From Swiss-Prot:
PANTHER family for the chain: PROTEIN EMI5 HOMOLOG, MITOCHONDRIAL (PTHR12469), SUCCINATE DEHYDROGENASE ASSEMBLY FACTOR 2, MITOCHONDRIAL (PTHR12469:SF2)
Keyword Mitochondrion: yes
Signal peptide range in chain numbering: none
Natural source organism: Saccharomyces cerevisiae (strain YJM789)
InterPro entries: SDH, SDH_sf, SDHAF2
UniProt name for this protein: Succinate dehydrogenase assembly factor 2, mitochondrial
Keywords attached to this entry: Chaperone, Mitochondrion, Transit peptide
GO BP annotations, alphabetical order: mitochondrial electron transport, succinate to ubiquinone; mitochondrial respiratory chain complex II assembly; protein-FAD linkage; tricarboxylic acid cycle
Native organism taxonomy: Eukaryota, Fungi, Dikarya, Ascomycota, Saccharomycotina
């Protein structure tokens, strides 16, 4: 691929994509969470998800869990999800019981864009898994994302989480 399509290789690398396995004659590149390949036919699923298993935390004190969830809500990597989850966490995290914290922790282990699309009810782009269909927490996040007060969202100050 590097020799066959130097302009494409340079363009993809400048945009943060990584070219892999160019010796096989097929092109494959990554944009972080999704892999694309040129050797699939029209009937194949072109996008394959990469999922990293979350760390199993046992006996984590609630104050440490809340602190970790605040950090994970604020530092997602995608601005839209950062703003949405950080505001949601600032408003609701301190009121959550242990079961709700576990559910929120599980939600944060999902892909950023999936969380964003589910929160904004864009199920055409990212279908909602059965696991989250009856989630009160996700419904609360969806209601929060409607921004009925029409506030301009920004990253909440850390004092808002107390």
């Amino acid at each position: 691929m590097h020799n066959m399509f130097p302009a494409l290789t340079k363009t993809l690398s400048l945009q943060g994509y990584k070219i892999i396995n160019s010796q096989t004659g097929s092109a494959a590149w990554s944009c972080g969470r999704r892999w694309f390949s040129s050797d699939k036919d029209d009937h194949d699923d072109v996008v394959t998800r990469i999922k990293i298993s979350p760390i199993k935390r046992t006996n984590e004190p609630l104050d440490k869990k809340r602190a970790r969830l605040i950090y994970q809500s604020r530092k997602r990597g995608i601005l839209e999800t950062d703003l949405l989850l950080s505001g949601f966490a600032a408003k609701y995290l301190k009121k959550m019981n242990e079961e709700e914290l576990e559910e929120y922790d599980s939600l944060l282990n999902e892909l950023d864009w999936d969380i964003y699309y589910w929160a904004t009810k864009n199920f055409k782009t990212s279908p909602l898994p059965d696991k989250w269909a009856n989630s009160k927490l996700l419904k609360q996040l969806q209601e929060f994302s409607e921004n009925k007060e029409k506030e301009i969202l920004s990253m909440p100050d850390l004092s808002k989480y107390q």
